[in-house]
């Protein structure tokens, strides 16, 4: 009896246990799902906060004005025109917001850097930055020449018998240039230039101390600051640069003989050396009227700017009361200075928005001058022809929107050219 009851109890318990387990399992799964759902909600809230922060940053960026693209430094006028047409097309076809900001960016980019404008001014000689401009410039030129004089003959084609004399001339020239310019409609330019010249020359020669070839003597002559030859010019810009054509300017310059002419200046013999003759004064001008037509071209090949110029100077014939250099002698006559031809080519680069640098070579070729004493015929002046070649290194520095600093170094490459010439100009635009 007891065994049957125990068996029945075991059977009942075995049937009830799986049912209790089945009811307990869903409770555990629900708790797990609730925990996972809570974690997902927390992640969602964190993501929502992150999205809100990102959205706020995007709005701040959109509210800021668009930053224009960097300016091209060596941009030609042809590019300016193309940029202008692109701006018009963008504003006409673009959207209300994106099109206007993009067009404004192109408009800002179409404006040339100030260094490029200064570069064009110096290369073409046409200053179009303002209606009026005034330029102050200082120029220093150094000239040092030696001449070997042989008085004797060669023996056995290799031995020189006689006297050897070495002559030397050292000259320092300072010029203060005052130039005023007027620009009319960025097409015509009128200018006048007034130079103030200071000169000092030192002459050396052997044969001092009674003709001793080993002894040398020297004499110095100076000229106080004096106005030189005033000149004025007219320039016309007849061609604007395009994709295929350069910027072209034609000019005419007239020089008046307002300085001290070199004719009639007497050569005085040195008291210490019979071989040395020095002028009693120094000239500050040519003494004759001259006219110089010229042409200058400028073309952009980004990032470089190529430029070139050519000019021809014709000196007018004139008469003087005295053309002799002998002391106590006065001879009137006519003077015909030799005409000159000058050309130059170079390349320039814009270093940044305020500075540019240029390199160029130039050459001046002058014909011989002639004199005609009263009652005589025309006579050519010995060694009056010249060939002066230069290598030029220049810069433009935009000190402000109105003031530019232009240093330039010219190195003489031929015997007729000064050893070097350094100039510093300060054009100011009103």
Swiss-Prot record:
The record marks 425 as: Forms salt bridge with Glu-122. Residues 92-101 have a biased composition (Gly residues). It is a multi-pass membrane protein. Disruption phenotype: Deletion of just fapF in an overexpressing strain yields cells without amyloid fibrils. Deletion of the entire fapA-fapF six-gene locus shows no visible growth phenotype. Changing residue 126 to A: No longer secretes FapC across the outer membrane. Its main location: membrane. Residues 29-64 form a coiled coil. Keywords: Cell outer membrane, Coiled coil, Membrane, Protein transport, Signal, Transmembrane, Transmembrane beta strand, Transport. Residues 143-172, 199-224, 257-288, 315-339, 366-386, 413-419 are extracellular. One of its GO terms (biological process) is protein transport. The chain crosses the membrane at residues 132-142, 173-183, 190-198, 225-238, 247-256, 289-298, 305-314, 340-348, 357-365, 387-397, 405-412, 420-428. GO terms for cellular component: cell outer membrane. It is found in: Cell outer membrane. Residues 62-114, 203-223 are annotated as: Disordered. Residues 113-125 are annotated as: Alpha helical plug. Residues 25-131, 184-189, 239-246, 299-304, 349-356, 398-404, 429-430 are periplasmic. Transports fibril components across the outer membrane. Upon overexpression of the endogenous six-gene locus (fapA-fapF) in situ cells form large clumps during liquid growth, make large amounts of biofilm and produce amyloid fibrils. Expression of the 6 gene operon in E.coli strain BL21(DE3) induces flocculation and biofilm formation with copious extracellular fibrils. Homotrimer. Belongs to the amyloid transporter (TC 9.B.153) family. This is Functional amyloid transporter FapF. It comes from Pseudomonas fluorescens. The gene is fapF.
